[in-house]
């Protein structure tokens, strides 16, 4: 399954990559944005791509034909200030964060992100790497109220209490160890026809638990707090979010930076996909792109 980059032309307009520039892609995953950026910063440019997926980074390194100027490092984008210092790299001219999943990750990650037919037997790890505790272990002991709160807050699931109760009751009898196990428990807790067929009944719960398991909102807040340690003055950040909580964090952080004079908006309102892009790439439907230029 080929990964199609979301809002590609709009990202390029915000980043404005040019020959000799240094651009960081903190979520390099499928590499679609990266290829377009590389075409524009060479010759003379430098590129750093990071991702927590060790297999993906290994693949990118194996196919890298310019290791003196193009670097792929396994790491969390939240730690980019430390990664740049450790690797002896300067502050960047551009930073891209695409906070969505690549088609490859969703199709068969081996980590239980999806409950599709090809993924349902995957272990319920739900983490990008091995640094964080697998979700299957978290679910063995998480209190019912905390579980319900997470599913409601991060997934917007109205029936979070029903789902949390079903998970707790099920784990007393049998552990939830695969993606399919969790999906079955959630579906059984909800009435047929719930969501009116628009999405699978388990989708919101999977989203919520993935966000929790990887501290996705905490990572986003951390990199936003450290943006001046990643970007040089005049450097540009382009951030694509797919969830209202993520977008709100970016919106408020950019607003605070602009008010304090540390940065200026490229676009005050989020850029969204056109009808044509949504038709060709349904993943883009919920994407929102915000951009900012660092001044200090």
Question: Where would I find each of the regions flagged by the language model?
Answer:
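S-adenosyl-L-methionine-dependent methyltransferase catalytic core, i.e., the SAM/SAH-binding region
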Residues: 1-296
């Amino acid at each position: 399954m080929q990964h199609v980059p979301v809002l590609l032309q709009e990202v390029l307009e915000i980043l404005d990559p040019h020959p000799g520039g240094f651009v960081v892609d903190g979520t390099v995953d499928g590499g679609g944005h990266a290829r377009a950026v590389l075409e524009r910063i060479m010759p003379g440019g430098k590129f750093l791509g990071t991702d927590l997926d060790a297999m993906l980074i290994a693949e990118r390194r194996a196919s890298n034909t310019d290791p003196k100027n193009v670097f792929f490092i396994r790491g969390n984008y939240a730690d980019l200030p430390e990664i740049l210092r450790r690797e002896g790299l300067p502050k960047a001219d551009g930073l891209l964060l695409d906070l969505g999943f690549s088609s490859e990750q969703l199709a068969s990650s081996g980590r239980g992100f999806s409950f599709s037919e090809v993924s349902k037997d995957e272990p319920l790890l739900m983490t990008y790497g091995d640094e964080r505790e697998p979700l299957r272990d978290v679910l063995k002991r998480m209190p019912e109220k905390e579980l319900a709160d997470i599913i409601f807050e991060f997934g917007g699931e109205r029936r979070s209490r029903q789902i949390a109760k079903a998970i707790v009751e099920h784990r007393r009898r049998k552990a939830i160890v695969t993606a399919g196990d969790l999906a079955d428990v959630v579906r059984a807790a909800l009435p047929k026809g719930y969501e009116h067929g628009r999405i699978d009944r388990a989708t919101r719960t999977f989203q919520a638990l993935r966000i929790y398991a990887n501290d996705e909102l905490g990572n986003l807040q951390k990199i936003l707090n450290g943006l001046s340690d990643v970007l040089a003055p005049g450097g540009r950040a382009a951030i694509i979010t797919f969830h209202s909580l993520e977008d709100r964090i970016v919106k408020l952080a950019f607003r605070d930076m602009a008010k304090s004079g540390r940065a200026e908006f490229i676009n005050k309102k989020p850029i969204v996909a056109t009808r044509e892009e949504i038709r060709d790439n349904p993943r883009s439907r919920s994407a929102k792109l915000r951009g900012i230029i660092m001044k200090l």
